Amino acid sequence: MKSAAYLAALAAVLPAYVNAQAQEWGQCGGIGWTGATTCVSGTVCTVLNPYYSQCLPGTATTAPPPPPPPPTSVSSSSSSSTSSAPPSGPSGTSPTCSVASTIPGFSNAALPNPFVFNDGSPVQSKADFTCRQQQILALIQGYEAGALPGPPQSVTASFSKSGSTGTLSITVTDNGKSISFAPTISIPSGTPPANGWPLVIAFEGGSIPIPAGIAKLTYSNSDMAQQTDTSSRGKGLFYNLYGSGATASAMTAWAWGVSRIIDALEKTPSAQINTQRIAVTGCSRDGKGALMAGALEPRIALTIPQESGSGGDTCWRLSKAESDQGHQVQTATEIVTENVWFSTNFNNYVNNLNVLPYDHHMLMALVAPRALVSFENTDYTWLSPMSAWGCVNAAHTVFSALGVADHHGFAQVGGHAHCAWPDSLTPSLNAFFNRFLLDQNVDTNVFTTNNQFGGATWTQSSWINWSTPTLS
């Protein structure tokens, strides 16, 4: 009888214990978190940043993570090619457009005007704005991203396929050094379109659903530039090529890697990829990287950052204002102590954001007139939901000025775990895929928020003090 009573009591307790554990992909810790701090079997509570720990598939280990694999040599396969002068990936600067990496004496507490040149003169045409984008590109590199190298001396690529999985083997050589990496491509079934399959380059595999008829390349961006913590500075394939002292941040190095992938695809027709229809995506820290890649690489047709938060589709000034209103958000001062996503030079400005002659609305402006759709999650205050809404509104003025407002989308909802995809957003996502990768005539007017900012307030007139011009 005692045994029966004991088992009955245990049976009553166990469900409560299980329920007290966070489920797979659920939150299990972080600043201000008061919920479950242990995870269900088969998952481990993983610290993503000081504000958020998540139950990820796997088992706990006390051993440090293994170092990235060494570069692999390119094997012979059905197709290979070498380019001694691969096409330029990141856009350069025109000799007729005056650019500078910094603007001494600049100060503006509001969001800087994207429609004036560095000297204060107005942008009056689309051609003018192309020059303005070159100025913005130089400023972002000068203040926070670090220097983006130009095209390397050579890119060698080969492609092999086994079933529905392809392997793109890439070797990049510059200044007498070489690196190699080999991303895999999930290839749709059936006959490819005449120009090849559209492609999504997914940072660390991505988190969004990809429609049928679109290939997916899994980009191990953390091999290109490590991002464990601040000790990762200067580590990864990119730095093996350009040196550990290169000023490029991890995100800039990731963008450089995306450009080399596109170089390789352009030189490898057997991969049957349409290099005019490429998207890039990632979530959280990798969402920040996807946005940076879309901004720096003009061959990307569609950029899809997911829950990129501070350092992504939010603005530094707005995140600070959100923090000043008493909300626990990631700010510039905190993020530079967390990881190596930005150059060390950015540390000089995080305590005086007013001197930045740009903010991240202008990072997003580098994507225009190409397509950009971003998604945010208001359930997580540290993602700076008010800052995201304000920042994308400021960026939207650029797309509107260029006559392509429907090339820029945004949706901000809650009700799901960080980086878990809510089905309610799939129609908006698919609209952008259908239009910009699958060439369908569909409506992409998507720009919405649930206005759940945790009490933080967005007042547009306090931050956007310019009128949107019509550029021709």
UniProtKB/Swiss-Prot annotation:
Optimum temperature is 45-55 degrees Celsius. It is found in: Secreted. Its main location: secreted. A motif (GXSYXG catalytic site motif) lies at residues 282-287. The keyword Cell wall biogenesis/degradation does not apply. Residues 1-20 form the signal peptide. It comes from the Eukaryota. Glycans are attached at residue 465. Disulfide bonds join 97-131, 283-419, 315-391. It is an enzyme of class 3 (hydrolase). Residues 73-96 have a biased composition (Low complexity). Pfam families: CBM_1, GCE_fung. It catalyses: a 4-O-methyl-alpha-D-glucuronosyl ester derivative + H2O = 4-O-methyl-alpha-D-glucuronate derivative + an alcohol + H(+). The active site is at 284 (nucleophile), 418 (proton donor/acceptor). Its EC number is 3.1.1.117. Gene3D superfamilies: alpha/beta hydrolase (3.40.50.1820). Residues 62-97 are annotated as: Disordered. Residues 21-56 form the CBM1 domain. GO terms for molecular function: carboxylic ester hydrolase activity; cellulose binding. Substrate binds at residues 288, 330, 338, 382. Belongs to the carbohydrate esterase 15 (CE15) family. Glucuronoyl esterase which may play a significant role in biomass degradation, as it is considered to disconnect hemicellulose from lignin through the hydrolysis of the ester bond between 4-O-methyl-D-glucuronic acid residues of glucuronoxylans and aromatic alcohols of lignin. Can hydrolyze benzyl glucuronic acid (BnGlcA), allyl glucuronic acid (allylGlcA) and to a lower degree methyl glucuronic acid (MeGlcA) in vitro. This is 4-O-methyl-glucuronoyl methylesterase 1. It comes from Phanerochaete chrysosporium (strain RP-78 / ATCC MYA-4764 / FGSC 9002).
